A protein has these predicted regions:
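N-terminal segments that mediate ammonia production and transfer
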Residues: 1-172
Length: 172
């Protein structure tokens, strides 16, 4: 939702669970809804972590949240969860050395940002984003940190970064 006092978005509700999304849990009074269903991509998942949903997106730091689609190469990140590690890289604007795949949405300081490297897909149409191509969608330009503008539904360009290693060749 938009919070005029905060000059941006505010998080109204967060649901973390395993399995399919139960849309009945959504109250229906929202402007944007970020949904990410995924398998945990941590180094090790134990029963306690599973029970508390530690590795369910979004990752949280203070009042900021990161949803990450992709996998950072094992041994290329510190900590237990690649998304937590990636979160630190994002907040430090240091994505050039991230070795792996990522397409992300970030809620930070009442704003929503989207970004991806060259390897992970991310598509958009107006205010809809998806890792799966859908009718009328265009590709989000890779290697750019984009800020979502709530009022105009356009993206404002932020900092640029490089894909560390792209195993694919795209001929011109």
């Amino acid at each position: 939702d938009l919070d005029p006092a905060a000059n941006g978005f505010y998080l109204k509700q967060q649901i973390k669970s395993y399995g399919p999304l139960d849309v009945k849990q959504l109250d229906g009074e929202w402007d944007y809804c970020i949904v990410h269903q995924q398998a945990p991509t941590s180094k090790e998942v134990n029963n306690t972590d599973l029970a508390i949903g530690r590795f369910i997106h979004p990752a949280k730091k203070d009042k900021s949240f990161l949803w990450h689609n992709g996998i950072i190469k094992e041994g290329k990140f510190e900590g237990d969860w690649d998304t937590e590690w990636l979160f630190d890289q994002v907040l430090n604007e240091d994505l050039n050395e991230v070795d792996g795949t990522f397409a992300c949405m970030l809620y930070h300081e009442n704003q929503i940002y989207v970004f991806r490297n060259e390897i992970s897909p991310l598509f958009k149409s107006d205010s809809t984003f998806s890792s799966t191509l859908f009718p009328g969608a265009s590709t989000v330009t890779p290697n750019v940190y984009w800020k979502l503008d709530y009022n105009s539904e356009i993206l404002e360009q932020g900092f640029n970064f490089k894909t560390k290693e792209n195993p694919y060749y795209f001929g011109e």
